[in-house]
Curated annotation (Swiss-Prot):
Keywords: Cleavage on pair of basic residues, Cytolysis, Ion transport, Membrane, Nematocyst, Secreted, Signal, Target cell membrane, Target membrane, Toxin, Transmembrane, Transport. Composed of a long N-terminal alpha-helix and a core region rich in beta-sheet structures. Before the pore formation, the alpha-helix binds the lipid membrane, partitions into the lipid-water interface and stabilizes the monomeric molecule on the membrane. Finally, it traverses the bilayer, thus forming the transmembrane pore. This is DELTA-alicitoxin-Pse1a. InterPro entries: Actinoporin_PFT (IPR050677), Anemon_actinoporin-like (IPR009104), Cytolysin/lectin (IPR015926). The record marks 160 as: Important in the initial contact with the lipid membrane. Residues 50-59 are annotated as: Plays an important role in the hemolytic activity. Octamer or nonamer in membranes. Monomer in the soluble state. Phosphocholine binds at residues 101, 134, 152, 154, 180, 184. The keyword Signal applies. It is found in: Secreted; Nematocyst; Target cell membrane. It comes from Phyllodiscus semoni.
């Protein structure tokens, strides 16, 4: 009897872990075996995809995603989350960002394929400074031209308001103070709180976009074929 009990104990000790392990093997494709405990890994990946400095599917871009990104920046008086959807039929490659004031804690996404959207954030400089989050970012398109996006979240709303703008420049052109001044002062900058539609006049493209009016600003832009 004692030998039987020992045998039964050893049998159970070996078989139970094996039975649990088999539940983790979900599918087998070719020479690759997909192993998972449950859906938590997949859900975590989906949740972490929509972060500043990332590229997501263009169809996923929405104001609620930008709100989530803003929350991750923390309590800063002036900040902005930017989402630009590439439906141009072209590939974009990052050039640079110029800041009139403020900074960013993330890197501008390097490549944005067609039907993808870039996510980016900016904020005022850290510390008790009366500055906003103001600048322009530039992407070279596979057409050879440059897409520029200007954003302005000022510190003093008694004198200024949120503004944004988009322009396509001939050839490759990095963002700088001259580009910023042109988009802010001379190229019909766009006011917040309204959906704007505009022909960009280059590469057969147009824009559709919206910017909120508060200090926790969200800017969503769709660049599309005309």
């Amino acid at each position: 009897m004692r030998h039987f009990v020992v045998f039964l104990y050893m049998f159970l000790a070996l078989s139970i872990p094996t039975a649990f392990a088999k539940k983790h093997i979900v599918t087998k494709k070719g020479n690759h075996q997909d192993i998972t405990n449950d859906n938590e890994g997949e859900n975590a990946e989906k949740k972490s995809a929509a972060v500043a400095g990332a590229v997501i599917a263009g169809g996923e871009l929405a104001l609620k995603i930008l709100t989530k990104i803003l929350d991750e920046i923390g309590k800063i008086d002036r900040k902005i989350a930017i989402g630009v959807d590439n439906e141009s039929g072209l590939k974009w490659t990052a050039l640079n960002t110029y800041y009139k004031s403020g900074a960013s804690d993330v890197t501008l996404p390097y490549e944005v394929e067609n039907s993808k959207a870039l996510l980016y954030t900016a904020r005022k400089s850290k510390g008790p400074v009366a500055r906003g989050a103001v600048g322009v970012l530039a992407y070279k398109m596979s057409s050879g031209n440059t897409l520029a996006v200007m954003f302005s979240v000022p510190f003093d709303y008694n004198l200024y308001t949120n503004w944004w703008n988009v322009k396509i420049y001939d050839g490759e052109k990095k963002a700088d103070e001259k580009m910023y001044n042109e988009l802010y002062n001379n190229n019909n900058p766009i006011k917040p709180s309204i959906w704007e539609k505009r022909d960009l006049g280059q590469d057969g493209l147009k824009l559709r976009g919206f910017m909120t009016s508060n200090g926790d600003a969200k800017l969503v832009i769709h660049i599309e074929k005309s």
